[in-house]
């Protein structure tokens, strides 16, 4: 996590346990090489660097003995007669190879929160990615954005910081604060100067055009979220009045167990009062937050802030982060951004991996294994960009079916010049996405999670692939052909017995 500062999100260590040693991380896999069986420990906690009461390690291993350490609780957190939730520990077992190992982990992760197509699947647009901050958001701007978003096939339009009466520290119009939010009882009401009729016109147009309106929200951080009940009521009030049920939760800081417990109370209360209809997009970009393995029952993860303005959006970087995480975190629980490639082209002058060197369709394709996030203003797109709507409409037809499977990385790690991709495994069927980055080879042999020496039918769904029947090679290898660099294809596959 802390993706504002980190761009390498997964680290793997492979050891033969010997004398007693400590290891850091959220996951430990242990395999018995004699019989091919194994177990895993999942520590349901933030990343090691931001855990509470951290003792310097998460696991100890000594020959065949393994221990999970670090409850995230000290004696100061205990209150007589009150239960205190420690960090969770999941123990799982498997038999077989790496696919069985990862499937065992994923079967638990997928059951933490049922992925409902009408609630959890989304192709979201959030205008903050164009760096206008809160200078543009008002009724007129949002109505225009919703119309264009509908043309693009967007399902959810999220109004970020600036819709509300209160001003945050990130405001470009009047520097505000997150401290003592409830000194202003109207802080979380629509700004009457920007939205004189409230959010009703925007919400109603969205319903008419099939675009769900979503909002940004920053819980009241002071005194360990002591005002969590007021925050919960504000969110429930927005749900009751406008039907808004998807909220980006930003600005979290969890310095102690009381803060963590009150945040859970906030999330639980909102889900209880809305019949489980609300989705929280939990921002993982900064601060002491939940990370990839905590609060997963509440929604999905807003993964990263990337901007062409600061030249830190590279399509292959975004693809790489999704590819690396997808082995251990459900890809369908990650919001993955694509940006307006026509902005700030001069800042990437001469850079072969500049966003402008890719088709807009390819940028969208890099997000398809996750929950796509159009991190941009629709009004800033040129006319040629609107053609992506046909691709997004076709993607939405298979989005949930793709996300139902166990999504795992295939091919080589994205580097800007690799053959790479994803596989969604669902029994004897599933999907494959292949990317030919700026690689000179028209064809590649790519290892997959398919069984060896098996006949498989490949049916193109999106992109540039051609229908084929192949027999897999060693490690499930398939031969893939794409006619040009920076191209992609999505196949539906089925094993032929």
Features from the language model and the residues they span:
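N-terminal accessory beta-strand-rich subdomains and adjacent acidic, glycine-rich linkers
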Residues: 1-106, 445-448, 455-456, 462-482
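A short, polar/charged loop/turn motif at coil->beta-strand junctions and beta-hairpin connectors
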Residues: 5, 117-121, 426, 452
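Short, glycine-/Ser/Thr-/acidic-enriched flexible segments
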Residues: 46, 130, 220, 437-439, ...
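Active-site-proximal substrate-binding groove within the catalytic cores of carbohydrate-active enzymes
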Residues: 82, 86, 267-469, 481-483, ...
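Short beta-strand-to-coil "C-cap" segments at the C-terminal boundary of structured domains/repeats
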Residues: 92-94, 492-497
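An acidic-aromatic substrate-binding cleft motif
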Residues: 100-148, 152-156, 160, 165
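Aromatic- and carboxylate-enriched substrate-binding clefts and catalytic-loop regions
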Residues: 158-346, 357
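C-terminal engagement modules used by replication, chromatin/transcription, nuclear envelope/ESCRT
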Residues: 176, 487-494
């Amino acid at each position: 996590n802390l993706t504002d500062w980190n761009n390498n999100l997964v680290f793997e260590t492979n050891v033969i346990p010997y004398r007693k040693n400590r290891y850091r991380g959220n996951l430990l896999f242990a395999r018995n090489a004699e019989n091919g069986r194994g177990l895993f420990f999942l520590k349901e906690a933030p990343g090691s660097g931001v855990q509470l009461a951290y003792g310097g390690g998460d696991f100890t291993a000594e020959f065949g003995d393994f221990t999970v350490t670090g409850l995230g609780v000290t004696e100061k957190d205990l209150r007589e007669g009150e239960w205190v939730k420690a960090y969770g520990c999941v123990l799982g077992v498997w038999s077989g190879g790496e696919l069985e190992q990862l499937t065992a982990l994923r079967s638990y992760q997928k059951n933490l929160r049922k992925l409902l197509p009408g609630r959890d699947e989304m192709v979201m647009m959030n205008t903050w990615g164009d760096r206008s901050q809160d200078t543009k958001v008002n009724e007129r701007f949002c109505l225009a954005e919703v119309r264009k978003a509908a043309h693009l096939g967007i399902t959810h339009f999220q109004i970020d910081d600036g819709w509300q009466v209160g001003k945050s520290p990130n405001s470009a119009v009047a520097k505000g604060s997150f401290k003592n939010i409830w000194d202003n009882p109207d802080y979380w009401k629509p700004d009457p100067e920007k939205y004189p009729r409230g959010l009703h016109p925007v919400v109603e147009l969205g319903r008419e055009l099939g675009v769900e309106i979503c909002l940004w929200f920053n819980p009241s951080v002071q005194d360990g979220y002591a005002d969590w009940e007021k925050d919960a009521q504000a969110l429930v009030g927005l749900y009751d009045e406008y039907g808004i049920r998807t909220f980006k939760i930003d600005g979290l800081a969890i310095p102690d167990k009381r803060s963590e417990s009150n945040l859970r109370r906030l999330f639980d209360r909102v889900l209880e009062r809305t019949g489980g209809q609300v989705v929280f997009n939990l921002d993982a970009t900064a601060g002491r937050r939940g990370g990839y393995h905590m609060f997963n029952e509440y929604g999905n993860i807003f993964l990263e802030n990337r901007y062409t303005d600061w030249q830190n959006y590279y399509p292959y970087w975004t693809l790489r982060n999704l590819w690396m995480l997808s082995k251990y975190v459900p890809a369908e629980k990650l919001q993955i951004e694509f940006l307006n490639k026509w902005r700030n082209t001069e800042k990437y002058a001469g850079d072969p991996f500049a966003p402008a060197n890719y088709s807009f369709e390819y940028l969208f394709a890099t997000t398809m294994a996750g929950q796509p996030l159009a991190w941009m203003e629709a009004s800033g797109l040129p006319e040629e960009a609107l053609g992506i709507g046909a691709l997004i409409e076709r993607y939405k037809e298979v989005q949930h079916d793709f996300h139902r499977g166990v999504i795992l990385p295939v091919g080589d790690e994205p580097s800007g010049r690799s053959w790479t991709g994803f596989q969604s495994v669902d029994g004897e069927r599933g999907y494959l996405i292949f990317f030919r980055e700026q690689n000179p080879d028209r064809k590649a042999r790519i290892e997959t999670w398919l069984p060896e020496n098996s006949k498989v039918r490949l049916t193109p769904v999106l992109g540039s692939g051609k229908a084929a029947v192949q027999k897999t090679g060693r490690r499930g290898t398939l031969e893939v052909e794409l006619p040009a660099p920076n191209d992609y294809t999505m196949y539906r596959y089925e094993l032929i017995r």
